UniProtKB/Swiss-Prot annotation:
This is Large ribosomal subunit protein bL21. It comes from Pelotomaculum thermopropionicum (strain DSM 13744 / JCM 10971 / SI). One of its GO terms (cellular component) is ribosome. This protein binds to 23S rRNA in the presence of protein L20. GO terms for molecular function: rRNA binding; structural constituent of ribosome. The keyword Protein biosynthesis does not apply. One of its GO terms (biological process) is translation. HAMAP family: Ribosomal_bL21. The lineage of its organism: Bacteria, Bacillati, Bacillota, Clostridia, Eubacteriales. The keyword DNA-binding does not apply. Residues 83-103 are annotated as: Disordered.
Amino acid sequence: MYAIIETGGKQYRVREGDTLYVEKLPAGAGETVEADRVLAVIKDGEVMIGTPSVENAKVFLKVERHGRGKKIIVYKYKPKKNYRRKKGHRQPFSRVTVEKIEA
């Protein structure tokens, strides 16, 4: 059985026991959060597709840790004008494990 969930504006295909990196969740490490926006559930060949989400379907995610991704460098300049700006960014993320899928 697997499900397609939406969190942080992105969609993920998950099974029980999967570990994935999602946009940072407002929960502490070790806490369990509920992904109630389940778009589809596939169970024993039976497909349940929601409009927009499947009713009474829940996916429980355990937050393992929070972190920040690799640094990306944004560099912009204007030619011949001595205008240069260098800026770095590290996107925060949460590493979660799928504990249980209810459908």
